[in-house]
Amino acid sequence: MFDVLVYLYENYWRPDACPDHDQLSKKLSAVGFESEEIADALTWLDGLAGAAESHIGTQSELSLRVYSPSEQDHLGLASIAFISFLESAGVLPPAMREIAVDRAMALGGGPVALEDLKIIVLMVFWSLGEEPDALILDELFVDAEDRLIH
């Protein structure tokens, strides 16, 4: 599913630039994605669109987020720490944080891998038509193992 999401981010400027689900499914199949992976991604994107509509403007900039035990278990410490990092850097406002948490919680399975959370955050920016600044975009795309330490 995450490969499909990255493909959409790289090939469509905004969600409204994407064709309808049927045409998009055909295009994604033609590129080589599996039908189950495509269906999962499109369902997840529908949830993203709904979450974006329901969370915009509902949080104060001064609010403090307390994660429930189920959120802590599902997100994992690395993902929660990364969300906190983005918030403290001033690039992930509370409404976008809530959308990211909502979409991460929509995933099945155990703790969300940090790489997957980064794609989720990237897709939240994408869904709202916002481009993260270059440093944050680098943080979202580059693996820590690939970084060159000076």
From Swiss-Prot:
For this entry, the protein name equals Protein Smg homolog
User: Which range is the signal sequence, renumbered to this chain?
Assistant: none
* Family under the similarity heading: Belongs to the Smg family.
Which Pfam family is one of this chain's hits?
DUF494
Classification via InterPro entries: Smg (IPR007456)
- Domain of life here? Bacteria
